[in-house]
């Protein structure tokens, strides 16, 4: 049991304001750049910015003290002592005060001259049904992007999964690398509105929820009968925001199938979404997907 240690108000604020990026680097944690944030290499669902953190799997977050308590499993006194420097003999720097950031405009990347790579990847590597892929392409929900490196010597091709609002305006984009060697890039385009994540609305009373766009396409390929009548959404992660938007747009819903990944983050998100759906008077059926070794996203 940790002994009681009285901390002053100044000490509490100093501990809460510790720069988490520097703190984690000093402790040997690997961080990955993700837009303006950093992600933990050991847990991609957690993002860090300054003294603040957010776990996108559990939709919880806070400042440095709560992070150290949760991530390292420490008591409040032990977390305070660690952040104030008792562990290494010196204090950690405070995070810089955040300046207001202008809203990042949402811009889809330029299209490639052909869809050759995206068709080859989705049909041959991911076994998506051609007719289903054609249907999504015709609706401009999927296309192949082509972006050049800063020095203009390289081209980068990605599959782009587009989310539209109710007026047909693109509001969200998720990019997935098409290279099959090593770890492929995936991520949401900056400025994307999570409410309008990649989705298809058929209009009936059934909704299928997935983490990744390719999971959505794979499910339809496996169960194509009457798919045009159903509703589907890929959260491009584990946030509940796209699901709430579907509830708003589809008041006729009666049944929701949660088809998230069969891992810890998927289980936690499914339970959270099921509780949310219950609050709205809807039944939720859990149908976990099994990620393949080469990454189903």
Predicted regions and their residues:
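Phosphate-handling DNA/RNA-contact segment within nucleic-acid enzymes
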Residues: 147-249
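Short, aromatic/basic amphipathic alpha-helical patches
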Residues: 246-247, 268-280
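Conserved active-site segments centered on acidic
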Residues: 81-114
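N-terminal structured subdomain of primase-like DNA metabolism proteins
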Residues: 1-91
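Terminal peptide-recognition signature
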Residues: 55, 68, 122, 211, ...
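Acidic beta-strand-to-loop metal/phosphate-binding motif
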Residues: 209, 254-263
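Acidic, metal-coordinating catalytic cores used for nucleic-acid/nucleotide bond scission
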Residues: 238-240, 260-270
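Single conserved hydrophobic/aromatic residue that forms the stacking wall/gate
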Residues: 288-297
